[in-house]
Regions:
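Active-site cavity-forming subdomains of large catalytic enzyme subunits
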Residues: 1-183
Length: 183
């Protein structure tokens, strides 16, 4: 898998012609390869990273600016506006930020910025567009990843039979799993 990840980065550096963003690279893994389970899950995990980047960036933007909003709406002294023990809406906004795992360092940064007179923060947000920075930051996006299945594999799926994953170095069985589980 390490080699595939390196190849994926290299393919990303060499864009194919035309309007598509994908490089002209195809990766095929045999259904009986010892790394087949990891290969299948590789792209799924990378897609989950994109979802986390997108959701996390938008959550940061929202919650950090809610802290600024609580400070701006304060009608008491300016020193007390940034003190959550005196500014109840600020305390609530900070709690909400912590509830969704906004790091303490970012909350402190917003409070420090507010003390300097800033009224909002621009936190970079990402989207799920294929050409977005979020997708560019994960691996497995620069190739057509496919699995080579054989008639014997399909028969094993149909029969709910065991399926052997074969080491390429010596031909021995690395692991036995249910074909349907892999399917």
């Amino acid at each position: 898998m390490g080699f595939l990840k390196i190849g994926d980065r290299a393919a990303g550096a060499i864009k194919s012609g035309g309007t598509t963003r994908r490089a002209a690279k195809m990766v095929i893994c045999d259904a009986d390869h010892p790394d087949i389970e990891e290969f299948i899950n590789w792209k799924v995990k990378e897609e989950q990273k994109v979802a986390s980047i997108v959701a996390g960036s938008k959550m940061h933007e929202q919650r950090l600016n809610e802290i600024f909003s609580a400070i701006r709406q304060w009608d008491g002294s300016s020193e007390d506006a940034v003190d959550p023990t005196k500014n109840s809406p600020l305390k609530t906004a900070i709690r909400q930020a912590k509830k969704v795992a906004i790091p303490e360092t970012y909350v402190k940064r917003v409070l420090d910025y507010a003390k300097q007179g800033y009224a909002s923060i621009e936190f970079p947000t990402y989207d799920t567009d294929w050409d977005s920075e979020a997708y560019a930051s994960v691996s497995g996006q620069n190739s057509n990843n496919s699995i080579r299945v054989t008639d014997s594999f399909l028969k094993a799926v149909q029969d709910d039979a065991d399926w052997e994953l074969i080491r390429r170095t010596d031909g021995s069985v690395a692991k036995t799993i249910k074909a349907r589980k892999l399917w």
